[in-house]
Amino acid sequence: MDKRLLTIQDVSCVGQCSLTVALPVISACGIETGILPSSVLSNHTAGFSGWTFHDLTDDMPKILDRWLTEKVTFDAFYTGYVSKAQIPHILDIMEKT
């Protein structure tokens, strides 16, 4: 049985970081990888004068409900940038999947 990893972190639309870097590296290792974006940023926060930010905390329970309905499970978890408010949701996801 193949193992499945869930990575939970932000998506920076510009900049070599976060999910845009983690996903291809993990996938290249042959690991099936699910993603749960914690937020979407217009660009990386380093080297830019500003950025836009969209928090996805409120979407986490809805995504978990869908995964539970579909009986999606994960064997490992890898987090990047997450907010303090997201930690209880992440623990819930880890427990239930």
Predicted features along the sequence, with ranges:
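Ribokinase/PfkB-type carbohydrate-kinase core domain
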Residues: D2-G15, L19-T97
